[in-house]
Curated annotation (Swiss-Prot):
Enzyme Commission code: 2.5.1.18
Organism, as annotated: Arabidopsis thaliana (Mouse-ear cress)
Similarity remark: Belongs to the GST superfamily. Phi family.
Keywords: Cytoplasm, Detoxification, Transferase
GO biological process, one term: toxin catabolic process
Molecular function terms, GO-annotated: glutathione transferase activity
Gene name for this UniProt entry: GSTF13
Signal peptide bounds: none
Protein name: Glutathione S-transferase F13
Taxonomic superkingdom: Eukaryota
Length: 219
């Protein structure tokens, strides 16, 4: 039986899992969850994720939530299919993948997601973005990208010379970020820009990106 992924493909966190599924050439069923109708707050969904956020994944008797936990599971279960996203055959390489995945989760994502929330989500809720929050997180993001610029001057991808979860996890929020007037934070750093353009050229991304349809209503 194919895995069932519950969510809306416009969600960055759902897209993160979709990218992984496509990279691993894994059969799955996407079960739509209407976020605008708050279907992620219904009891049927809360039984899968008590925090009421997409995505959730069901694989036989296993239910998972949190996108990075889901991608780790998919990458491990299907380690011999598709792209090797974890470098599991070499403990040192695998450790570097985990290291840069932690950087994404604890440094990059908090900054970029805060910007996206203010510029895309808040206006959709009929409110005005908080300029101070945007500015503070753009400053933090710039410092993080300076570290990336140096790193990507040494390796093609964050965890080495092959594409892994450490790169994949960045893609959806960065895609939305590049739709804003602040895309220069990426484009003005040659190594980061080249890395991003490489990520955008992957077949899995080309399958997922049409679903990322939310656009900024303010800059």
């Amino acid at each position: 039986m194919a895995m069932k992924l519950y969510g809306d493909e416009m969600s960055a966190c759902v897209a993160r899992v979709l990218l992984c599924l496509h990279e691993k050439n894994t059969e799955f069923e996407l079960v739509p969850v209407n976020l605008f109708a708050c279907h992620h707050k219904l009891p049927s969904f809360l039984s899968m994720n008590p925090f009421g956020k997409v995505p959730a994944l069901q694989d036989d008797d296993l239910t998972l939530f949190e996108s990075r936990a889901i991608t780790a599971y998919i990458a491990e279960k299907h380690r011999d299919k598709g792209t090797d996203l974890t470098r599991h055959e070499d403990p040192k390489e695998a450790a570097i993948v985990k290291l840069w995945s932690e950087v994404e989760a604890h440094h990059f994502n908090p900054a970029i997601s805060a910007v996206i929330h203010q510029l895309i989500v808040v206006p959709l809720q009929g409110e005005s973005p908080n300029a101070a929050i945007v500015e503070e997180n753009l400053e933090n993001l710039g410092k993080i990208l300076d570290v990336y610029e140096e790193r990507l001057g040494k390796t093609k991808y964050l965890a080495g010379d092959t594409y892994t979860l450490a790169d994949l996890h960045h893609v959806p929020y960065t895609y939305y970020f590049m739709k804003t007037i602040h895309a220069g934070l990426i484009n003005d750093r040659p190594n980061v820009k080249a890395w991003w353009e490489d990520l955008c050229s992957r077949p899995a991304f080309l399958k997922v990106s049409p679903g990322l349809t939310v656009a900024p209503t303010t800059n």
